[in-house]
């Protein structure tokens, strides 16, 4: 069985201290943001059994408030194709099962390549965890007005969309404020999930309902495994049966996730 590399947040948490997950594609500037937010207040170690770094830190916000920040390895999606991506996939899967999820997810995207970067963001939205989208590298855009911030916030249904530039060191205070506000509100995000045909949804429910606390994430996760011919924690025979049932309904399982 595949070994998981779950993150255990710092144990010395108080009612005024929360932990936040920093997630994003490789080379989106995520770690630079982590370093700017935490400064020297960070701890770097390795995930068990591998050389992938695990970075945790403490961020000091307004009013002497603090929150703990975890910088997850960069990944393009939750369908793991490397050790780094497997760590993120395992971690997110544990959150979907209700195992100590973060209070807020900060999804960092490259503002100059939204279409590619937002794929991971939309996958994470199915967790129903409050999310802040960070548009990094805004300094590289010839015309920053081409991104309609409020429209993007509304369409994604996230707590905030914050434009920043880690390279130019601007926008970090706005990001801290947005995180702090989300931690105070701890409100569920409202967003429109990917539509799934009812016939397919009924088949998927047979597989995923016992395993997840978030039905939206569970459906999306099961859909990925069915369409990609992947295993799911010993449920291979069930997946194959559901895949065959969907084929009998006249749907192509190879294109369900598209």
Regions found by a protein language model. Name each.
Residues 1-83:
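Conserved G1/Walker A P-loop phosphate-binding module
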Residues 33-34, 52, 69-71, 88, ...:
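Residue-level signature of catalytic and energy-coupling elements of molecular machines
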Residues 49, 53, 82-85, 89, ...:
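Amphipathic alpha-helical transducer elements in NTP-driven molecular machines
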Residues 49, 74-75, 111-115, 137-142, ...:
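Conserved nucleotide-binding/hydrolysis micro-motifs of P-loop NTPases
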Residues 60-64, 87-160:
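Conserved C-terminal guanine-recognition region of P-loop GTPase G domains, centered on the G4
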Residues 139-193:
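Canonical P-loop GTPase G-domain recognition
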Residues 182-258:
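Extended helical scaffolds that flank P-loop GTPase cores
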